[in-house]
Design a protein with these regions (language model features):
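Periplasmic/cell-envelope proteins involved in peptidoglycan metabolism and beta-lactam response
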Residues: 119, 126, 159, 167-198
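Beta-lactam-recognizing serine transpeptidase/beta-lactamase-like catalytic domain environment
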Residues: 1-158, 196-198
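Short, conserved micro-motifs enriched in small and acidic residues
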Residues: 39-46, 163-171
Length: 198
């Protein structure tokens, strides 16, 4: 779980224990199926974004919150602040992390989604996914990314059920990042009228 202030189920990472608990059989080759989006892994978009954030910050998994802070109605004081807490840490060797990040950068600079990201003011690391559901329906389209590449501050995750290829979501992710970085720093300039939380 991510710690977000909503009802949330734990994600499922496919593996021998889970497969056998569901009455299935885990084979040595099953790990290859998991690596390409098959088998029984199940994660929410917020869990995927949390995973990407953990990966690119070097292995510290922090709680997710909807709000940064709550201010009094006259904006004179901060009533409550939400600080993320460390939920867990994972060990990632620098060379492995850099290899993963380099692969994610290559997707946006030389890969199937480069046309969407070439005009952004920052470099982006991303990964597409097409999680198979059944032979009768389109795969679930999955797209995760982080930016800026050298000093990450935002992670996105998108899932469209039966959306086909994850690369189809690249344009949407690029639009979100374009807006995010074009408005960066302007939040302090928003007038107080009609603004409840900042």
């Amino acid at each position: 779980k991510t710690g977000i202030e909503l009802e949330e189920s734990s994600g499922v990472m496919a593996g021998p224990e889970y497969t056998e608990s569901m009455g299935g059989t885990w084979y040595e080759g099953s790990v290859l199926s998991v690596a390409i989006g098959q088998e029984s892994s199940q994660f929410t978009p917020i869990q995927l974004a949390s995973y990407i954030s953990t990966l690119v910050n070097g292995g510290t998994r922090k709680s997710t919150h909807l709000l940064k802070e709550i201010k009094s109605s006259d904006y004179s004081q901060i009533v409550e602040t939400y600080e993320p807490e460390v939920l867990s840490t994972i060990e990632i060797q620098d060379k492995n992390l850099e290899a993963v990040k380099a692969g994610m950068l290559a997707l946006t600079t030389d890969g199937s989604v480069r046309r969407y990201f070439q005009d952004l003011p920052v470099q982006v690391g991303a990964k597409t996914g097409s999680a198979q559901v059944s032979a009768q329906t389109e795969s679930n389209a999955v797209f995760v990314c982080f930016a800026p590449y050298d000093d990450p501050e935002i992670a996105l995750a998108m899932v469209v059920e039966h959306g086909g290829s994850g690369s189809e979501l690249g344009a949407m992710a690029a639009d979100i990042l374009s807006y995010y970085f074009s408005t960066k720093g302007s939040m302090d300039e928003i007038p107080m009228e009609n603004t409840l939380i900042r």
